[in-house]
Amino acid sequence: MVSQFLMIFTLISIWISLIWGVVILVSAVHFWLKHSDFKVDKEELPYYPKVTIVVPAHNEDVVISQTAKAILNMNYPHDKVELLLFADNCSDNTYQECLAVQALPEYAGRNITIINRKGTGGKAGVLNDALKMADGEYICIYDADAMPETNALYFLVKEVMKDPERRVASFGRNKTRNAKQNFLTRCINQEIVVTQRVHHVGMWHLFKIGRIPGTNFIIQTEFVKSIGGWRNGALTEDTDISFKIMQSGKLIALAYNSEAFQQEPETLKSYYMQRKRWAKGNYEVVISNFKHLFGKGNWRVKLEVANYSCIFF
């Protein structure tokens, strides 16, 4: 009897997953057919809000200079950009590399602050420290190994400006910076392409559900303060705050033209450790939000809890 029940349950879950996958795929295909011209529409925005860009860097002296330069060279009014570079508990030359970028003559007069941080809380702790310092209406996050494309910030801002009251955040797409390094990075690149160009696009196009990634996104500064900031020590602070946004009834908009190039693991060991951390962090988020699946609340939260539950249980 038990074995028959488990077999039926397994078959039903497989069919539900297949149908769900087809629905999301159709939604993504419809979206890309509507946006198949790939034109980069760069009209002037009616308003350019000030943005505080935060870069948490822990022992990233190899890549931090390139990333900082890419951020400072973005196509966004320079007087509307504040850059906070955090050398977070570093034992290498990350802090010195940040100072070297700040000293370059082409960035003279730019609003750059470099913090040699010795605090706790991991990435979430860095973001909470940045929240106390930020002067911008929006906070933008880039990991130290994520180089934004020239118009990345412009497209993120453009998307939230379509409805600033509801769209408290927007996120772009990430590409693999070292995709051709070896077989593993090629596989990771294909995974990212499917996840971001199919799943994320399909979810936004059909349900207006967005998910904040770890990098290449902006969020309203005052909104983050209103929910108490990021949860210190959270392994997946991006997923955690995404659920808080949905619980408030606000939206995380997809800026499909905003792109950043991110370094991915090149060895199986580093890949395993990264995915283990993500799985543990997402598992914690699902457990803490599982109650929303059955009670009264936002339907988007229920849908996301159900989706994450199927993945991590």
Language-model features and meaning:
Residues K69-K80:
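Short, acidic, metal-binding catalytic loop of nucleotide-sugar glycosyltransferases
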